[in-house]
């Protein structure tokens, strides 16, 4: 009917677009993780971390600090359970633990990303090799004619 005519006309003019193709599940999962990846990138830039060694060097003192504060807090829980210092320690521990978690995630996910990049490069090289082979066979076919 008329509605279909309008859809067809607007589509041909480029006003209406086709449905976007389905995104692969792997890519969809990566998109979901995008906010976390951005947060990790900002963390790396903020602390000027460029290698895993620097990441470990940043994380180690944090873990030692958390351990010392936890030990102090445990001692305070026994001696004065309602002390103000316990709340102060908890406020200091929260961002330290968050930074440690981010460091651990960066370390794990950077390895995963390296592996994905390696696989993508392999697939790209294989595709280029296949293209070269088909191009050579086409050239041979045209030369033999």
Q: Where is each model-derived feature located?
A:
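Extended intrinsically disordered terminal tails
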Residues: 1-145
């Amino acid at each position: 009917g008329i509605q279909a005519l309008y859809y067809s006309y607007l589509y041909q003019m480029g006003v209406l677009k086709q449905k976007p193709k389905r995104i692969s599940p792997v890519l969809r999962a990566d998109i979901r993780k995008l906010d976390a990846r951005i947060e990790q990138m900002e963390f790396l830039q903020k602390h000027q971390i460029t290698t895993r060694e620097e990441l470990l060097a940043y994380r180690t003192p944090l873990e030692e600090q958390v351990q010392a504060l936890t030990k102090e807090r445990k001692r305070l829980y026994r001696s004065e359970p309602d002390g103000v210092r316990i709340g102060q320690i908890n406020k200091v521990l929260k961002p330290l633990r968050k930074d440690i978690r981010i460091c651990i995630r960066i370390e794990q996910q950077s390895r995963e990303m390296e592996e994905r990049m390696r696989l993508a490069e392999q697939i790209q090289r294989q595709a280029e090799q296949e293209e070269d082979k088909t191009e050579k066979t086409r050239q041979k076919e045209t030369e033999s004619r």
